[in-house]
Amino acid sequence: MSSDNGGIIGVVNDPTSTVASGVWQQEEQYEAKVNDTWPQRALFTTKSLRFDDGSSDYLTKSVSSTSNRRTFTYSTWVKRSNLSGSNYPRLFNPFVDSNNFFDVYFRNTDALNIYSYSGGSENIDLVTTQLFRDVSAWYHIVLAVDTTQGTDSNRVKLYVNGSQVTSFSTSTYPSQNADLQINVSGVTNVIGRNQSGTNNYFDGYMAEIILVDG
């Protein structure tokens, strides 16, 4: 700490890329940031998974027992890389069969699509007007589902970077108390491609992929 830092006498502040100990005046911190010597927070890139559509990368997680199919929250951090790669790249795809599945993916327009198909009928189809084309940006995507809600638009809520998305080019909501094709015993949750494994590979980074039921 510097000798004029609030009257405290000590060694001169000398931050590194990872440590800035001691007592700091605001102007000292500002100057260190300007000089790019102030430690930066850990970025997701160093703690994320890299999905390469050219290498057909993906993850799977099997569901061991059926839990809440009406209320759940899915969240992830996503950073896209190749916008001209796979068609309709998948983020999350629990799949029972061709008549029963759940899907979170980017459309070819780069809109985000939340889709659910149960018993051969579509029960969720939300397509954002917002487009996700910034390959330098991390997007925090949170999907909060509660089909027990009385108001249809409250049954599926989408948040991007902390703000609720309310503008959709398509907006189909599930019926009240609908059981969705998620958290179903024996089903494999696929991350980074569709269940069939033939196409729709995601290209980019993902971090902190979380699914909470109830």
What do these predicted ranges mean?
Residues 11-15, 22, 26, 37, ...:
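Compositionally biased, intrinsically disordered low-complexity segments
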Residues 1, 23, 30-32, 206-211:
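Interface-prone segments of viral and bacterial extracellular assemblies
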Residues 18-20, 130-131:
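Serine/threonine-rich, low-complexity intrinsically disordered segments
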Residues 1-19, 110:
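Short, intrinsically disordered N-terminal pre-domain segments
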Residues 20, 26-30, 151:
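Noncatalytic linker/hinge segments flanking ATPase motor cores
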Residues 4-6, 38-214:
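Extracellular glycan-associated modules
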Residues 25, 31-42:
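Extracellular glycan-recognition surfaces and repeat-rich motifs
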